[in-house]
Amino acid sequence: MAGNREDRKAKVIEVLNKARAMELHAIHQYMNQHYSLDDMDYGELAANMKLIAIDEMRHAENFAERIKELGGEPTTQKEGKVVTGQAVPVIYESDADQEDATIEAYSQFLKVCKEQGDIVTARLFERIIEEEQAHLTYYENIGSHIKNLGDTYLAKIAGTPSSTGTASKGFVTATPAAE
């Protein structure tokens, strides 16, 4: 652990803010996709997209809280631009790519935290990486269904309810854990 405590803390705050910016982008991207899927009458897909966006909101808040605990200022800037007007198959392919890149980045951020001796933030990244992995698996599964079954799968989803209710907890907390 090279460097003084303030330098180590600054490095952790830096990666936390990078992660927060990634989460803020994901929130905007996934909510835009939620609205698009809902407009196309793919309610079940829209509802799950909203739940995943809620997970990302929780992640952004968790990062902000940790940044504040360390004496930093949470960023309000999102990383990247929101892509609009995507076809349904493209949504799931691009979101899987985004989640994969997020997992890779967070794994690097986790290493930084461990190198700086911040086990609390390292544990936060470990927990969030697990949730991002659940999102990746979901996007890959839906993408595979769309690729293999095409319009047949989408017809099955068309007309399904999109409401997630007012007490939505997010995708990870709403999905039963694998036993």
Swiss-Prot record:
Any GO molecular function: heme binding
GO biological process, one term: intracellular iron ion homeostasis
Cofactor note: Binds 1 Fe-coproporphyrin III group per dimer. Binds 2 iron ions per subunit.
Residues of the Ferritin-like diiron domain: 1-150
SUPFAM superfamilies reported in the protein's UniProt record: Ferritin-like
Domain of life: Bacteria
Keyword Ribosomal protein: no
Substrates-to-products reaction catalysed: 4 Fe(2+) + O2 + 4 H(+) = 4 Fe(3+) + 2 H2O; Fe(2+)(in) = Fe(2+)(out)
Note: The catalytic dinuclear iron-binding site within each subunit is known as the ferroxidase center.
Subunit architecture: Homooligomer of 24 subunits, arranged as 12 dimers, that are packed together to form an approximately spherical molecule with a central cavity, in which large amounts of iron can be deposited.
Name this protein carries in UniProt: Bacterioferritin
Name of the gene: bfr
